[in-house]
């Protein structure tokens, strides 16, 4: 009986040692993410994602507004395309994430300055937009106008 009690006590101590040696759980809240990311400002064209992904000539100062609106109406995600060619996906500050289209629709085809929390992962960029304004001083060439 004493032998079984000793074995159980040793096994229990081993489990406690292993649990204490495990790394702490990963942070998952937006507050924790914000603590690890900095506020940034990006500038670029609000448009559908399909054209600049499929057409390398797609850039931040020239687009077909009809094509962009057709893609957006069909459900293509909205992005901000910078002059450097980086695409920023707008995301919410909540989990689960919620749609940002309503916030961005008035800016489709416009060059904007967006400020917020920026995230990057393996070359993909996202931004939680806290402020967005049109940059009227940047000329965007719209096909068909």
What are these model-derived regions, one by one?
Residues 20-145:
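OB-fold and OB-like single-stranded nucleic-acid-recognition modules
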Residues 11-20:
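Hydrophobic h-region of N-terminal signal peptides that target proteins for export
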Residues 1-11:
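Bacterial N-terminal signal peptides that target proteins for export
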